[in-house]
Regions:
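Conserved catalytic core of Hanks-type protein kinase domains
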Residues: 38
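Amphipathic alpha-helical segments at domain termini/boundaries
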Residues: 1-4, 34, 42-154, 172
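Glycine-rich beta-to-alpha active-site loop
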Residues: 1-23, 27
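NAD(P)-dependent dehydrogenase/reductase Rossmann-like domain
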Residues: 162-173
């Protein structure tokens, strides 16, 4: 997500997403801040709050990646784009999507609906999902530095908590 352009392998094995909430933390390295700016609030909430992993083609349709290429051509396509031999621009989401992300009333409405759904599914027992919701909703209107600072604090708090420790131990087996 920190790249200008992202090229992914169009292969059945490729999965793209931010699964950290399934381990009781939230996406780090700017993920909870960058994804909303890249694909908008509704799609990023779906990806981050569920921790779902998407096939490359689905990720491309959602705007998570800018180009997909068959595995045998992936390196060549990426090099051509990096060297300027092939033009590739990020998809523009359009003014409606931009307006929705920048509208505080819409963000508040989306947040309240998402919070209701989260509470219904988790009964508030998974704090990472609620923290991720707050991070994603705030992302379009705050600076990268502010978002990174808040994200680091949230990850540190969540990673040292009992829910994260329990989920990681389940993951490890």
């Amino acid at each position: 997500l920190a790249c200008d352009l992202i090229v992914a392998s169009d292969d059945d094995k490729t999965r793209i997403g931010l699964p950290e909430t399934q381990l009781g933390i939230l996406p780090g390295w700017g993920g909870s801040h960058r994804l909303p700016k890249r694909i908008g609030l509704p799609l990023s909430l779906d990806a981050i709050l569920t921790g779902r992993l998407f096939k490359a083609r689905v990720a491309w349709k959602r705007g998570m990646v800018d180009r997909i290429a068959k595995p045998e051509y992936l390196l060549e396509v990426a090099k051509d784009i990096a060297m300027g031999r092939k033009k590739l621009q990020r998809k523009h989401r359009g003014w409606k999507a931009w307006a929705m992300d920048k509208n505080p009333l819409m963000a508040k409405f989306i947040a309240s609906q998402a919070r209701k759904t989260i509470m219904k599914k988790t009964r508030g027992k998974y704090p990472a999902v609620l923290r991720a919701l707050d991070m994603v909703i705030a992302a379009p209107s705050e600076s990268r530095e502010s978002g990174a600072r808040k994200e680091a604090i949230a990850i540190a708090e969540l990673a040292s908590g009992p829910v994260c420790k329990a989920l990681v131990s389940i993951f490890k087996g």
